[in-house]
Amino acid sequence: MSQSDWSSDVCSSDLVSMKLTFLGANHEVTGSCTLLEAAGQRYLIDCGMEQGKDVYENQPFPVAPGEIDGVLVTHAHIDHTGQLPLLVRNGFRGRIYATKPTTQLCSIMLRDSAHIQEFEAEWKNRKAKRAGAEPVEPMYTVQDAEAAMQLFRGMEYNTKIELAPGLVIRFIDVGHLLGSSSIEIWVTESGTTTKLVFSGDIGNQHQPIIKDPTTIRDADYVFMESTYGDRSHGPRPDYVGELSRILQRTFDRGGNVVIPSFAVGRTQELLYFIREIKKEGLVTGHGNFPVYIDSPLAIEATRIFKDTDPDCFDEDTRALLAQGIDPIQFPGLQVSVTSDESRMINADRVPKVIISASGMCEAGRIRHHLKHNLWRPECTILFVGYQAVGTLGRTLIDGAVNVKLFGETIDVQAEICQLTGLSGHADREGLLAWVNAFSPKPKRVFVIHGEDEVENIFAQTLTEQGFTACAPYNGEQWAIGAEGAVCLQEGSRVRLEHKPSEGASRAATVFQRLVSAGKRLLRVIEHNEGGANKDLAKFADQIKDRKSVV
């Protein structure tokens, strides 16, 4: 089954007490958010911001933020956490649960995101004032981000936490980012326990610094990412060798290597590789070449990495630390904190490495470095991470001959390349290895967090391997229990580029709601076939009286 449909598992009246609503990152890779209603509680799993091209509209919360009891965070990336300050701004006052490293990283990442919101609003308002237009408000402010951080509770890995009677969770290291986790959730209702597992972003094998993903043995229902569910990374590349060759040929041309990098995780991996390159003398003829970290967020994140409990790191990193070696520090490493320091980086022609954020080139200082280096054929722009559809990074990788930066059209003459295989996400084989660790197979796997066709392809792959799998759309709602699952409400499959006019959209939406309600009612009726006559008679009376039955 490549996408969700109206077929269901076994369903009975007790199922409607636990519901899941898919709100974001379904048939797209950003804006992760799912609402769990169970054991008398309402919890969000992640609350992320959409980045890049918006393919399917994220759905509004079906309940007010003030009615949500808490949020469970899989990891600190903004596409999983970026809406938390907005949630708080709109009335959320519950607790936010995450691992301790995730909590520390969120403290800098949410504040940084808020600064970006404020800066963009200020920039738009300057333009609006000149045009006589109405001012705009930032999505949220630094104050909102700080208020959100007050609600965080840092948790240990592998420790069960009771959130409420009948609702227990546990964080398991999933090897995607420092502090990243899968989340196990046990829901007990009417004396029956159902186990859910949210994969979070599943890490790639053999990443530097952090551990490999931990697998989980049992679950009734699994909700798993599928970012690279249609492809293989291939044999593990020689990252150090490939990076050293890129540096060598670029420096020999007299150019800079500009690396758009995620400030958290990928930047620290690059420092790990460059330390090895310098230690082994793999780049020759350029002395102690300078390496700049030009991202205040990356600088703060690097500090958090250095202060983290070594138990969070892999065996190689722990061995270096035990010898008193800092695995992400080396001669020639320079940090740029202020804007003046950032501007000075491009003031000379000394070949250098510039690592700057954001990783998809959508914001931040990287855009200034692209402006100064994209037009220079001696330079290299090196991408080291996933580039979402619609981002400037994806545009460059796809072969753009020119791009617009700060109102100017810039010719793309620099070498554009990728450090292949360097990914924080598992490929198809890694995803299959993770899900095949469940024994017995889960009752159903919900495939999420993947580009449109990738989700369908990976759901079909799982089906061919004997899993019951589907790929829900934003707005889709399922009732789930120990006996089975049933789709209560179909998600929206209208792509934004094909979105009808507002009036037509409203009419279509209302009619679709009516059709969905009818299908939902028929499904519940069919699954009560064979029930006790007394219960069926009561059910019929409820329908006759037009009372809510679902």
Predicted regions mapped to residue ranges:
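Short, surface-exposed amphipathic charged segments that create phosphate/polyanion-binding patches used
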Residues: 167-171, 304-312, 432-433, 482-492
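Generic long, charged, amphipathic alpha-helical segments
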Residues: 404-435
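Short, compositionally biased "basic patch" segments
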Residues: 208-223, 310-317, 387-413
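Conserved acidic residues
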Residues: 9, 69, 220, 352, ...
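Hard-cation-handling environments
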Residues: 246-391, 404, 439, 454-456, ...
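A polyampholytic, Gly/Pro-enriched intrinsically disordered region
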Residues: 117-122, 309-323, 486-512
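His/Asp/Glu-rich metal-coordinating catalytic cores
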Residues: 16-72, 77, 81, 86-269, ...
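Single conserved hydrophobic/aromatic residue that forms the stacking wall/gate
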Residues: 1-14, 549
